[in-house]
UniProtKB/Swiss-Prot annotation:
The keyword Isomerase applies. Gene3D superfamilies: translation initiation factor eif-2b, domain 1 (1.20.120.420), Translation initiation factor eif-2b, domain 2 (3.40.50.10470). It catalyses: 5-(methylsulfanyl)-alpha-D-ribose 1-phosphate = 5-(methylsulfanyl)-D-ribulose 1-phosphate. One of its GO terms (molecular function) is S-methyl-5-thioribose-1-phosphate isomerase activity. This is Methylthioribose-1-phosphate isomerase. HAMAP family: Salvage_MtnA. It comes from Komagataella phaffii (strain GS115 / ATCC 20864) (Yeast). One of its GO terms (biological process) is L-methionine salvage from methylthioadenosine. Its EC number is 5.3.1.23. PANTHER family: METHYLTHIORIBOSE-1-PHOSPHATE ISOMERASE. Its main location: cytoplasm. Keywords: Amino-acid biosynthesis, Cytoplasm, Isomerase, Methionine biosynthesis, Nucleus. NCBIfam families: eIF-2B_rel, PRK05720.1, salvage_mtnA. The record marks 174 as: Transition state stabilizer.
């Protein structure tokens, strides 16, 4: 990708994040100087994706420590002359940061790890150095792990397709790519890795054979992902940039699309005739029994997949997303988002020829449009929980996991 979602300058201890609310209309970076800034960009979803949230949260703590460790700034009760008071103030600030997005476990895990560093630090300088080191390693490890997730996902898919020949399609929801992580992505990382393998011996995607491969990825279906439209704004941006063949669909189209492809319905024009063989999603939290919390709409995709023997449902996430403190999905706190996020939409203004309208600086004019009846009741959960019985595989950087003979994941 030409765009980095997260930029951290270690020499200057400076963090800048790409404002993802403006993509694909504008490219704008926001400086995150402290925990308040980190809370704001996470809560407003200017940065999103469980791994990215954890990384930005960790770096925001690092930046705040850098500004207070030498007494340059003394807000929020920091006292550089008293280590115990300093630590207590920092722990209170970290607890505040955790509340920005309660469902994503990666942020909680990262903050918990940093609090352990706080507890054992002997000096403020040592504390800063260790938090900086932890944050940088978190960022670097996430990128390495994403490539491993991609490779493990391809291994699982190859095994499942051992008796299948020809082109196939996959479906995904939300955005789980470079914009949601340090790079490559989780679920979208698997799709990237699949596409890299499929185009190794380029042919027409609908040819009967590709040299050396019995089956190959030929098409991706990206769900729009209402109400924040991460699929239409972000995933479509990434797929388009990498020239991976894809079609954008609304969140209420998957059942009819999959059924039409399986039945080869001739009276229904389709972007590709390759059947959907896998639905690949990310996760904001996976609990001990394998239940998976992800973007709202994921559960219904798993239900659809369960109706077709030939469609496998895959959850992809690093092991940092696994929450061993909760036994089942019933224990997951589901974040509720503001009503106006469902009843209005932000987009780029277009003219009569469907071209973007720009200002004198060449920036696309952004407009917020009301799309619903005013003053109505709204239910707007950000996530849902997919029960483990509907999940065929959980792919991590360590391996791909399938259920044992008792129908359980051994996480």
């Amino acid at each position: 990708m030409s765009l980095q979602a997260i930029k951290f300058d270690r020499q200057k201890t400076r963090l800048d994040i790409l404002d993802q609310l403006l993509i694909p209309y504008q490219t704008k970076y926001i400086q995150v100087s402290n925990i308040d800034d980190g809370y704001s960009v996470i809560q407003k979803m200017q940065v999103r994706g469980a791994p990215a949230i954890a990384i930005v949260g960790s770096f925001s703590i690092t930046c705040e420590l850098n500004s207070v460790k030498d007494g340059q700034k003394n807000n929020h009760g920091y006292d550089v002359s008293d280590l115990s008071v300093f630590k207590a103030a920092l722990e209170k600030r970290i607890d505040y940061l955790i509340k920005s997005r309660p469902t994503a476990v990666n942020l909680v895990n990262a903050c918990t790890a940093i609090k352990a560093i706080v507890e054992t630090a002997c000096t403020i300088d040592d504390l800063y150095a260790e938090v900086l080191r932890y944050s940088v390693v978190l960022f670097e490890d996430d990128l390495k792990n994403n490539y491993r997730i991609g490779a493990n996902g391809v291994r699982y898919i190859d095994n499942e397709l051992s008796n299948f020949e020809g082109p196939f399609a996959v479906m995904t929801i939300c955005n789980t790519g470079s914009l949601a992580t340090s790079g490559h992505g989780t679920a979208l990382g698997i799709i990237r890795s699949l596409w890299a393998k499929s185009k190794a011996n380029p042919r027409n995607a609908d040819d009967k054979t590709i040299q050396g491969q019995k089956s190959w990825l030929s098409h991706v279906y990206a769900c729009e992902t209402r109400p924040y439209n991460q699929g239409s704004r972000l995933t479509s941006y990434e797929l388009n940039f990498e020239k991976i063949p894809f079609s954008l669909i609304t969140d209420n189209m998957p059942a009819y699309l999959i059924d039409s492809l399986f039945s080869q319905r001739v009276n229904c024009p389709l972007p590709s005739r390759a059947p959907v063989k896998f639905i690949i999603v990310g996760a904001d939290r996976i609990v001990t029994n394998g239940d998976l919390a992800n973007k709202i709409g994921t559960f219904q995709l798993a239900l659809i997949a369960s109706q077709y023997d030939g469609v496998k449902f895959i959850g992809a996430a690093p092991t940092t997303t696994i929450d061993y403190t909760r036994d089942s999905g019933d224990d997951i706190v589901i974040e509720q988002r503001p009503a106006n996020e469902l009843t209005s939409i932000l987009g780029g203004q277009v003219d009569s020829s469907d071209q973007f309208v720009t200002d004198s600086e060449g920036k696309v004019n952004l407009l917020r449009i009301k799309t619903a009846t005013p003053n109505i009741d709204v239910w707007n959960p950000a996530f849902d929980v997919t029960p483990n019985r509907l999940i065929d595989s959980i792919v991590t950087e360590q391996d791909y996991l399938v259920k044992d003979s008792h129908g359980k994941f051994n996480l």
